[in-house]
């Protein structure tokens, strides 16, 4: 919508309206003086015409022309200014003393390709204002604007629309309570609830502005942007449409409704061209998982949106046809197979998001907690991976390794993977700990509980033996190439060793627990986040497990 052109219509009305001129020429089929009408007036009847030196022209069926250029015009009002502006209506009134006037009755103002229609159009030539207060519509080549009130103030070069404002454009629809346009700065100001709807996104705010020249907008007060599956909330959003980039400030929440994730913080930057967004200042990731949620904090978080191609092959029918053809030699069959594979490779594009968290990463869930320097959450394969000195706690168990990856299925933990330097510790009391160390770990969850663990490669275990009353009886020291641990009554305590384990049992008497600790033992429970609030407490240095 060309707000500047709208302002120009109003400006012509109040600055050059024929009714406001000091010198007016007139003629009609019949002119007479009516003495008893408002102290005396000229009565003009039939083909009435008024003209001014600057080219304004008005016609009507009849009129009263009083002193001080007071004019009352009736029926078939037509006003023309220059070659571009015309106004039609039923009646027109102007008071030369107060400088107030109006045109009523199906008023139509046309300026080039823009048309303003209303029932009553008011103007004040002294204060240089024009308005309608009973509803109006402005139609241009590609836009239609409607509102209950419209107002133009010439001294400030401001045009305003209020109540049920609606702007319809081929690219978007704008719904607002109040809009102002300042012609000097070419800026649209939003006052009150405002929605901007397009095919790609929806924008909402209750205060803000948009510069039509620079295409930069600033949204405040309940600012929100809805884009596909994503929603962005913030106290304020500053957006550059040309560069498709923006910043958000204070109480930021970016919601992915498909992946059920929320990234929050107090400062963010996003760029649609690169598909990147970052959040800092109390950055928090919330992963909604049924009745529970997983929370993660870091110094900064980055979100990436990109399309990933997945391979789809439909080979079965064609290959079966080749196998059934016994007249084809083996070499010919192999060549045909290769051709079929090449010809039938189909790629399906799928939207995927990745969230990366850097430095001082902390995780809290009711039954899982964690620490690391870096975290990556991938929506493509539904994984959460901790890098650089990761520590994870699951109920009574502490897990460490070179990196830790958790796989999700249907928003529940499904598997856990540690490729190297696996170490599991579970506390029995303040002095005694069950310990398992090995190279590679695969763990399996059921109902968010770790039910089974397989450790492959140089497996070692320190496992305390207890009687029915939980009293320690001794300790089992075992080495094996592979071991399996199963859950029983909420704890991982059923250990199965494979391929000729080496084992010995030591009694508790005179046992030195430090001497039997597996190399790299490091119990870090004091660092474990005990609540969501702990995620924002000052960090303690993460220890290295070798």
Predicted regions and their residues:
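Bacterial Sec-dependent N-terminal signal peptides
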Residues: 1-25, 545-546
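N-terminal amphipathic/hydrophobic interface segments
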Residues: 20-546
């Amino acid at each position: 919508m060309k707000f500047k052109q709208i302002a120009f219509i109003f400006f012509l009305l109040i600055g050059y309206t024929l009714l406001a001129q000091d010198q007016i020429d007139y003629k009609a089929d019949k002119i007479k003086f009516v003495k008893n009408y408002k102290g005396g007036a000229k009565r003009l009847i039939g083909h009435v015409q008024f003209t001014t030196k600057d080219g304004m022209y008005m016609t009507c069926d009849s009129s009263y022309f009083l002193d001080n250029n007071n004019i009352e015009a009736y029926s078939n009002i037509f006003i023309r200014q220059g070659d571009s502006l015309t106004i039609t209506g039923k009646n027109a009134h102007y008071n030369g003393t107060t400088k107030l006037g109006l045109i009523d009755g199906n008023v139509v103002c046309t300026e080039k390709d823009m048309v303003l229609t209303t029932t009553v159009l008011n103007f004040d030539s002294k204060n240089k204002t024009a308005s309608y207060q009973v509803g109006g519509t402005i139609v241009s080549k590609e836009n239609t604007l409607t509102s209950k009130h419209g107002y133009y103030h010439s001294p400030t070069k401001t045009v305003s629309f209020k109540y049920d404002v609606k702007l319809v454009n081929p690219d978007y629809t704008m719904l607002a309570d109040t809009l102002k346009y300042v012609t000097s700065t070419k800026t649209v100001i939003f006052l009150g609830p405002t929605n901007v709807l397009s095919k790609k996104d929806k924008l909402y705010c209750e205060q803000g502005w948009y510069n039509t020249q620079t295409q930069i907008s600033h949204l405040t007060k309940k600012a929100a942007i809805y884009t596909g599956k994503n929603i962005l909330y913030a106290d304020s959003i500053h957006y550059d449409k040309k560069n498709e980039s923006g910043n958000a400030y204070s109480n930021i929440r970016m919601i992915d409704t498909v992946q059920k994730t929320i990234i929050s913080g107090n400062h963010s930057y996003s760029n649609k061209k690169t598909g990147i967004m970052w959040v800092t200042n109390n950055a928090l990731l919330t992963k909604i998982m049924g009745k529970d949620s997983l929370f993660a904090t870091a110094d900064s978080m980055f979100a990436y949106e990109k399309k990933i191609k997945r391979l789809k092959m439909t080979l079965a029918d064609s290959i079966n046809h080749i196998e059934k053809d016994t007249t084809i030699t083996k070499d010919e069959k192999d060549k045909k197979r290769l051709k079929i594979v090449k010809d039938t490779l189909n790629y399906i594009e799928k939207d995927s998001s990745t969230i990366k968290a850097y430095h001082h990463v902390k995780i809290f869930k009711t039954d899982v907690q964690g620490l690391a320097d870096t975290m990556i959450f991938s929506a493509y394969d539904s994984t959460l991976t901790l890098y650089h000195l990761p520590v994870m706690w699951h109920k009574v168990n502490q897990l460490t390794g070179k990196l830790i990856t958790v796989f999700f299925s249907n928003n529940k933990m499904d598997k856990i993977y540690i490729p190297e330097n696996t170490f599991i510790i579970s506390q029995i009391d303040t002095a005694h700990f069950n310990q398992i160390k090995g190279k590679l770990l695969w763990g399996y969850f059921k109902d968010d509980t770790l039910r089974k663990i397989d450790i492959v490669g140089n497996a070692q275990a320190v496992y305390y033996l207890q009687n029915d009353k939980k009293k320690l009886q001794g300790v089992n020291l075992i080495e094996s190439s592979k071991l399996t641990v199963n859950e029983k009554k909420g704890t991982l305590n059923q250990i199965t060793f494979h391929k000729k384990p080496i084992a010995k049992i030591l009694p508790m008497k005179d046992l030195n627990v430090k001497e039997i600790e597996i190399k790299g033992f490091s119990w870090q429970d004091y660092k474990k986040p005990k609540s969501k609030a702990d995620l924002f407490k000052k960090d303690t240095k993460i220890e290295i497990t070798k």
